[in-house]
UniProtKB/Swiss-Prot annotation:
InterPro entries named among the record's database cross-references: Asp/Glu-ADT_sf_sub_c, GatC
The EC number(s) this enzyme carries: 6.3.5.-
GO BP annotation list: glutaminyl-tRNAGln biosynthesis via transamidation; regulation of translational fidelity; translation
The protein's assembly and partners: Heterotrimer of A, B and C subunits.
Name of this protein: Glutamyl-tRNA(Gln) amidotransferase subunit C
Catalytic reaction list: L-glutamyl-tRNA(Gln) + L-glutamine + ATP + H2O = L-glutaminyl-tRNA(Gln) + L-glutamate + ADP + phosphate + H(+); L-aspartyl-tRNA(Asn) + L-glutamine + ATP + H2O = L-asparaginyl-tRNA(Asn) + L-glutamate + ADP + phosphate + 2 H(+)
Disulphide bond pairs: none
Keywords associated with the record: ATP-binding, Ligase, Nucleotide-binding, Protein biosynthesis
Transmembrane regions: none
Gene symbol of the encoding locus: gatC
Pfam families linked to this entry: GatC (PF02686)
EC top class named in words: ligase
Keyword Acetylation tagged: no
Length: 100
């Protein structure tokens, strides 16, 4: 069980801000989560072997191969409009401002 002060500290560390009416809901939900974690911590798992795969299949591995991964020219070929040439010269996309 955690206290309201601990819940408020956790919210502050996570940079969460709550209105007065939602603080109680946050505290209740966080307290429930912590209680569930406590229940899981009480389970004795020392005689249980770890599960590595649900369907017990082996992954087919491939050899690593060094390849060229510079796709910038191919991506910039898709730029259209007035900024296409400039985008190819500076090698980045030019977009309208979306955040003010």
């Amino acid at each position: 069980m955690i206290t309201k002060e601990e819940a408020q500290k956790i919210a502050k560390l996570a940079r969460l801000k709550f209105e007065e009416d939602t603080v109680e809901k946050f505290f209740t939900q966080l307290s429930t989560i912590m209680d569930m974690i406590d229940i899981l911590n009480e389970i004795d798992c020392k005689d249980i072997e770890p599960l590595t795969s649900v369907c017990n299949m082996n992954a087919r591995m491939r050899e690593d191969a060094v390849t060229s991964s510079d796709l910038s020219s191919e991506l910039l070929d898709n730029v259209s409009g007035n900024s296409a040439q400039l985008a190819k010269e500076v090698k980045y996309f030019i977009t309208p401002k979306v955040v003010e």
